[in-house]
Amino acid sequence: MFPNSILGRPPFTPTHQQHNNFFALSPTLYSHQQLIDAQFNFQNVDLSRAVSLQPLTYGTVSPIQTSTSPLFRGRKRISDEKAFRLDGKRQRFHSPHQEPTIINQLVPLSGDRRYSMPPLFHTHYVPEIVRCVPPLREIPLLEPREITLPEAKDKLSQQILELFETCQQQASDLKKKELCRAQLQREIQLLFPQSRLFLVGSSLNGFGARSSDGDLCLVVKEEPCFFQVNQKTEARHILTLVHKHFCTRLSGYIERPQLIRAKVPIVKFRDKVSCVEFDLNVNNTVGIRNTFLLRTYAYLENRVRPLVLVIKKWASHHEINDASRGTLSSYSLVLMVLHYLQTLPEPILPSLQKIYPESFSTSVQLHLVHHAPCNVPPYLSKNESSLGDLLLGFLKYYATEFDWNTQMISVREAKAIPRPDDMEWRNKYICVEEPFDGTNTARAVHEKQKFDMIKDQFLKSWQRLKNKRDLNSVLPLRAATLKR
């Protein structure tokens, strides 16, 4: 991607290097994304209605690779795959409203490892400690189990499934983003040697579409000695340097770089090779944590991903899915869907943070958060509602049942809870709790006109869909497919 900038010929002169002691510490965070080989082999969904998550492999490498070997000239490192015997035990998983439901939790036995959840990243780590961070070693990854999509027994459910299968992010889309991330990490490490660049958001959380942008988090201070970067001063300074080099040194590969001085400043840019738009922030590490929390929810129940993707498409079509214009962010929309599925009389989703607090605690170090999806078995709900019924129920819930004035959406608690009386919440029209840091993810909705527009769209869409039971009545499928 950047052929003249990595292998023996850095694009930045020594005068442009950072010599501040603040960034001169040797890196200790061994990112799960170091030179990931994005080996995805998605199955044909037309025949089997199944999506297979493919193995990725990673290992320890030096922050800046200067080898001239062909191995580091953009070619993939391929691990031998081994076949493992499937073995498991049965375990009880309690539904809050009914008798315990029996599910199969596949537990590793006799050295064999296989999970019923599709692990995106999975590795053993060497027990020896290097500055408090266990280094990773490259190993073969297991073939993940196929995730079958739900059956569609009515027209509306069939439309939802077909739109999902057409618009969901493909293996090639993720591979493009990962290759760009890996190359940019090497470039940025020439400025900040201890930094790591993480791909976060919808690209990894299971809710991405083919048209989804890429979100990147640059971590320049690492755990266990991690502390927050001041977003108004340090983050802006770091991003100013990154933006400058994007403009001057990488202009042949990156176009339209913009430094956005928001509450959480970002650099927006477009990669000319992959044609993907990216947003890059600094040390917004909660985004790394919630990426893997949402990924676990995405694959916990097979109706979640199709429902979320169609609702995001619906919101975008009606122009209520743009935080920069005072409406809902995609993240807030996803949390709203998860919350609805948690609050049904027979829930389709539980609260993962309550059931697995050790896996989704903020005390879990960043280099370990990717283990969480591997440790959670599927949740088998007794709720047999179709995708069409769930979409209708979602619209009805927020149109007629949820109390916007007094309640806050909480996925962490798996219920609507009273709004806090703090200033941060008092004057906001919509309150959606961020599961890790407790902030309001819907704070962008600060105008009554936009709030009324959002509520009105929920009500009108619910009424139309209830009468016609045709997705085209609220989301023209042809237009949605073209914007996939």
UniProtKB/Swiss-Prot annotation:
A motif (Nuclear localization signal) lies at residues 76-92. The keyword Cell wall biogenesis/degradation does not apply. It catalyses: RNA(n) + ATP = RNA(n)-3'-adenine ribonucleotide + diphosphate. Pfam families: MTPAP-like_central, PAP_assoc. SUPFAM superfamilies: Nucleotidyltransferase, PAP/OAS1 substrate-binding domain. GO terms for cellular component: cytoplasm; glutamatergic synapse; nucleus; perforant pathway to dendrate granule cell synapse; postsynapse. This is Poly(A) RNA polymerase GLD2.
